[in-house]
Amino acid sequence: MFRVLVSDKMSNDGLQPLIESDFIEIVQKNVADAEDELHTFDALLVRSATKVTEDLFNKMTSLKIVGRAGVGVDNIDIDEATKHGVIVINAPNGNTISTAEHTFAMISSLMRHIPQANISVKSREWNRTAYVGSELYGKTLGIVGLGRIGSEIAQRARAFGMTVHVFDPFLTEERAKKIGVNSRTFEEVLESADIITVHTPLTKETKGLLNKETIAKTKKGVRLINCARGGIIDEAALLEALENGHVAGAALDVFEVEPPVDNKLVDHPLVIATPHLGASTKEAQLNVAAQVSEEVLQFAKGLPVMSAINLPAMTKDEFAKIKPYHQIAGKIGSLVSQCMKEPVQDVAIQYEGTIAKLETSFITKALLSGFLKPRVDSTVNEVNAGGVAKERGISFSEKISSSESGYDNCISVKVTGDRSTFTVTATYIPHFGERIVEINGFNIDFYPTGHLVYIQHQDTTGVIGRVGRILGDNDINIATMQVGRKEKGGEAIMMLSFDRHLEDKIVKELTNVPDIVSVKLIDLP
């Protein structure tokens, strides 16, 4: 049974994919109430209230995936998640329309003084001259960050007859033309816009993006909107600009500290403030819960997730193409690790053929994960394999090869240790499956699975016969045997597979055979 803890309030309709599944148990409790059973959950679903910290990861020892029902993941320690091998997903599309509409409602309210006029009328006043506003038509809207939400806002602004100037370092001219916006530098947006709205994540680069210095570059009378993340606008700088008259008004849905207590900015008469309502519509709450539920269900079935924060994103079709190589990469990593009983400094991976056009970083991490699992006593998977390798002083690299091996696709790995190097080449052949086709320069062909024995020996008469006799005397049936050599009478290798694991005494007997150099036991899934 795959156990899911839902620690924040979510739409039950959105959770239906999990509720209806016959192999998933869903528990709706906050973290404190679930304290005694935290170690039993495979998945955790949160909104913004639950803080997913190092301490929580340490308690949730079975945790494999965290789903954030929303876009922002500020409340989740992504580095700790990665370190613990936990995938973090979000719902990047679920609240796009809701947030875009809220942003535009804030813009309209700010331009027409709607909240202030509403309070005035309810106070039995009728002061029309005090609330003369400005039209949106003909104004320039500056958008900082043209992601999904920014694009929806641009579309609505154009419908109001506004000119839209956008700063986004990843915006191409082609996309700008398609959306109908003007691509500008950040400074150009500051200088030209009548209204500026920010739609970026909160990062080291965007924290305080609109500060005393940058606000001073804006038009006098500019209006500023933040429905993205608290901290993108420096609140102290904004308050100063409102008080000196440079900024004509601000609409804020997010704050540096939430809820904002004793906040002079919130109290300012030219500020419209809402309590982080961007995603607070019935439709958005249903959408984000449904999106993360579907993703967690996919994960529980062993299928790829589309919105992982700390893994490469890929579609089902892309995953279908990559899956065979992902599986064999983990196996060859494990094979090398079990054969090299020495400290390792470097893992170099090479891709050849059409596989090189796929998301090779995912395959690389699968290989690293397979390599590290026999060597460490902590959780290792594709999420944290790179970090675990670096912690242990193991460098890794990947490159694309243009050489011809005779196979449509190949993965090769060269592992460098204190005393030796080890190389393996593998491929996947449709209808025939996974194959190891080279080990340490020896051509060979075998299916990497189950109980294996890798033998290095001299190519002399009788070695194979003596190996067979020892195994037969111990009632061991050989499932498959492959041999490889470079030249007659020189070094050779033998790879055998069995239906069960070999006992140590049999390995010792094999090791004592004349002309056998080494015997390595390998167990693969």
UniProtKB/Swiss-Prot annotation:
Its recorded reaction(s) are:
(2R)-3-phosphoglycerate + NAD(+) = 3-phosphooxypyruvate + NADH + H(+); (R)-2-hydroxyglutarate + NAD(+) = 2-oxoglutarate + NADH + H(+)
Kindly give the SUPFAM superfamilies that the UniProt entry links to this protein.
ACT-like, Formate/glycerate dehydrogenase catalytic domain-like, NAD(P)-binding Rossmann-fold domains, Serine metabolism enzymes domain
Q: How is its activity regulated?
A: In bacteria displays feedback inhibition by L-serine.
| Residues at the catalytic site | 229, 258, 276 (proton donor)
Q: Which GO terms describe its biological process?
A: L-serine biosynthetic process
Record flagged with keyword NAD: yes
Q: Which GO terms describe its molecular function?
A: NAD binding; phosphoglycerate dehydrogenase activity
Matching PANTHER family, A to Z? FORMATE DEHYDROGENASE 1 (PTHR42938), HYDROXYPYRUVATE REDUCTASE (PTHR42938:SF47)
State the pathway, as annotated in the record.
Amino-acid biosynthesis; L-serine biosynthesis; L-serine from 3-phospho-D-glycerate: step 1/3
Decide whether keyword NAD is in the record.
yes
Record's keyword terms, sorted: Amino-acid biosynthesis, NAD, Oxidoreductase, Serine biosynthesis
Name the chain's protein. D-3-phosphoglycerate dehydrogenase
Positions with a binding annotation for NAD(+): 148-149, 168, 200, 227-229, 253, 276-279
InterPro entries given in the database record: ACT-like_dom_sf, ACT_dom, ASB_dom_sf, D-isomer_2_OHA_DH_cat_dom, D-isomer_DH_CS, D-isomer_DH_CS1, D-isomer_DH_NAD-bd, NAD(P)-bd_dom_sf
Describe the family membership recorded for this protein in Swiss-Prot or TrEMBL: Belongs to the D-isomer specific 2-hydroxyacid dehydrogenase family.
NCBIfam families, alphabetically? PGDH
Q: Where is the ACT domain?
A: 452-524
